[in-house]
């Protein structure tokens, strides 16, 4: 076989995923994330392997969520973690080491995700865990892929980070 020829096997679900509006959803991602190679990889994969594309998109959303937790404030993250018996947060590295399930919980406990958003993102993670095992017990359908795309983009990747005021900032202004 020649090295110059690319072979791509298109998933039978790829056309359905594209027809369901996923490419239009990808246009809603914030420019800061659209510029990243991970999102361009997702755009290329959608038409070939939607299951892998949605796994990568969820990875991007979780990374974005971690960044948003740090931007919102490590002091708030630390308090929320302590109050809700999550792993302690003292610095940004602690957030990087948080598991996916725990970062979803922490973002909810900090108020970065509403309860319905938290449930949707947690469900996406559950679907992705099922996909990772790639066993015969569960196979992602078109609806699962579309759900992950829609949730990750609408709940996380299209929203700008929230900059919260800190008590120390207010004290400095008052003084």
Language-model segments: residues:
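Amphipathic alpha-helical interface elements
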Residues: 2-123, 138, 161-175
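Generic detector of isolated residues embedded in canonical secondary-structure elements
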Residues: 59, 127-130
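Elongated scaffolding segments in large macromolecular assemblies
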Residues: 129-175
